[in-house]
């Protein structure tokens, strides 16, 4: 605590000194600007002012520019001059952020000329006494202020002049803040200039010492007490604390406001006290730039790193997800596709000349090729058809094939326009043209349905060999852009690093399943945006009409679901092609169930029409799991008719009649892949019978290698050779067999296992199942060429003997198992006595019947083995 006697003594000492700012420069040199009148007759004491003046005089002998801007020192040459400091002359100082300075310079807020500053000082100080003028103006932009040296009028004391200027500034400030807006603003930000008397020797430097509320006071000579410092510095603003330094030669002052610290530093620096025995030097204490974010991350890694990663992930989602959704919408709507605008008049005008030139070039190349062929092979040109006839025949053949499926195409369109849980499955064997049927002949030729189609080829996803390949393929199918696959590797390393530092995973690394789900989720958002786009237009249109109609006659606005139900063309169509039960790579098996789940959500939310195109019947199980209570609309595409197949072969082989291929193409049926292979073989030099024989041999080898193989190929092989051999014998004699007849054989019991086995064989294209009202009815050959292969294998004695013996042995095994089961039951019944005599009689008859069958089967085996062996067609035995 400071005693009252101490404060009184200090005040008395301060009053006795009677510090008066004179800043007099006598003929003997610049004396101290602060002195006690009673000590004026004493010997001059060495001060900072006299030292600076002497150094300045020595250095500036040969210099012409001795202004304060150059030297940093203001010269006061007589007693009728006074230096005042005006703060807040500039909007912001040089210590403000650089980007804010650029912004202010762009707005021309900080661009002030010295004349403008002079006018501003005169305006805030008005009215100044007559004959008073500013003789020197030194802007100090870093501290937002300026020094002004005034010429005091004769007969006016310096103290009176300074007091009058202060009163004028205060009065003008009150007038400036008279408005309510400025009065309220001044409560938060007082930006009107204030004036202070410069008591020391200001050092006008442009060093990088930016203003701070903390000032360091260095004492040259005797130090001052805290009470003396308070009395000296309090006039510039409220002080927070006065901290003595570790040495008595310095102290620290902390002001409440930055404006007060700037004024004190510029007005007190260089002041001489205690009869010249104490000189004060003031400096801003450098601001310690503490990066609290870096400090927080360094000191709290377990908390900071997950937060930073979460913020980065959120930022990435906010920035890139809208971009990706936009590109997905572009992929679906084909907004920037040439096919979308090819019918426009402007586009036709541009492309028509290009097409003409292209046709000319193509015709020239064809003409040259024909001439070369005619020279190298004379006589063949006359046998060929003209180009026009080839084109017409090709169109006729194509139209013949697709006319057979026109009713099915109309059926699919009708299902789409009905808009009742549009979940359509298009099934058919490989090479039956399912993709062309759906895209080219059903959707793309419809003006309303062609503009919103998302085509997904599942085979591109399933055959990916790495995670990055899978992500790239999926992004390409969905239009998902941009995709940063390198982030997966980086995130894994970051996850390991974070786990090593914090002991827990960051969660930044995601599995490929999660990433694919995110991609399909964003695709769902894009589909919703496209589906509801027309609804938003409808809603706005009806709202505008209702605003013009009188009250009570407003049009009812449909809900979103009702509108989509009435306008099926607004919903995109998702075509999922090559949908299978299992992927080529086992690690990608999750793709098919995930796509099924995703598409089921689209249908349930009434956002899209979904069409599955598959040749794998087993893949429907994924759809049943995704929509267990949904009845799917199904279309089955069979092979082409015999007439269409013959027309195709005649066109491809350029034949005028079918005499050459008659009898050779019937076993091929209408399977397009086999027809194309047949054409390639003939073009390579084989005759039609030779080509057919080789193809039948390959099909036979495929049957024996895959279906009649004794060992289990994979987990999906749930049949045995005896079952396949029985089907081969039945289907070689008839085009189809009834399921009820097949179910009578002991090889195809129980029924649950039989259906699973037949479904698997249908998946591998050995057979084809036909259903009547959802119930299995008939079984036919899956691939037409297999019928000829079946006949060839059965007619071969060696192969027939091998598999017939295996077939009968399997039947014997089944009967022996029955006998063993009946005998076990008889043994258990004997313990009960004669109470179940009828049951014993029944079991005895069953055992006798099975035993008779075993004897019969063994006789057949003996008969088969007694036949002489012969060499088979495969030359394997």
From Swiss-Prot:
<keyword id="KW-1133">Transmembrane helix</keyword>
<keyword id="KW-0472">Membrane</keyword>
<comment type="similarity">
    <text>Belongs to the YME2 family.</text>
</comment>
<feature type="topological domain" description="Mitochondrial matrix">
    <location>
        <begin position="48"/>
        <end position="302"/>
    </location>
</feature>
<dbReference type="InterPro" id="IPR034260">
    <property type="entry name" value="Yme2_RRM"/>
</dbReference>
<protein>
    <recommendedName>
        <fullName>Mitochondrial escape protein 2</fullName>
    </recommendedName>
</protein>
<dbReference type="InterPro" id="IPR027417">
    <property type="entry name" value="P-loop_NTPase"/>
</dbReference>
<feature type="transit peptide" description="Mitochondrion">
    <location>
        <begin position="1"/>
        <end position="47"/>
    </location>
</feature>
<keyword id="KW-0507">mRNA processing</keyword>
<keyword id="KW-0812">Transmembrane</keyword>
<dbReference type="GO" id="GO:0000002">
    <property type="term" value="P:mitochondrial genome maintenance"/>
</dbReference>
<feature type="topological domain" description="Mitochondrial intermembrane">
    <location>
        <begin position="324"/>
        <end position="877"/>
    </location>
</feature>
<feature type="transmembrane region" description="Helical">
    <location>
        <begin position="303"/>
        <end position="323"/>
    </location>
</feature>
<dbReference type="GO" id="GO:0003723">
    <property type="term" value="F:RNA binding"/>
</dbReference>
<keyword id="KW-0496">Mitochondrion</keyword>
<keyword id="KW-0999">Mitochondrion inner membrane</keyword>
<dbReference type="Pfam" id="PF10443">
    <property type="entry name" value="RNA12"/>
</dbReference>
<feature type="domain" description="RRM">
    <location>
        <begin position="213"/>
        <end position="286"/>
    </location>
</feature>
<dbReference type="GO" id="GO:0006397">
    <property type="term" value="P:mRNA processing"/>
</dbReference>
<dbReference type="GO" id="GO:0005743">
    <property type="term" value="C:mitochondrial inner membrane"/>
</dbReference>
<keyword id="KW-0694">RNA-binding</keyword>
<dbReference type="InterPro" id="IPR039627">
    <property type="entry name" value="Yme2_C"/>
</dbReference>
<keyword id="KW-0809">Transit peptide</keyword>
<comment type="function">
    <text>Plays a role in maintaining the mitochondrial genome and in controlling the mtDNA escape. Involved in the regulation of mtDNA nucleotide structure and number. May have a dispensable role in early maturation of pre-rRNA.</text>
</comment>
<dbReference type="InterPro" id="IPR018850">
    <property type="entry name" value="Mt_escape_2_C"/>
</dbReference>
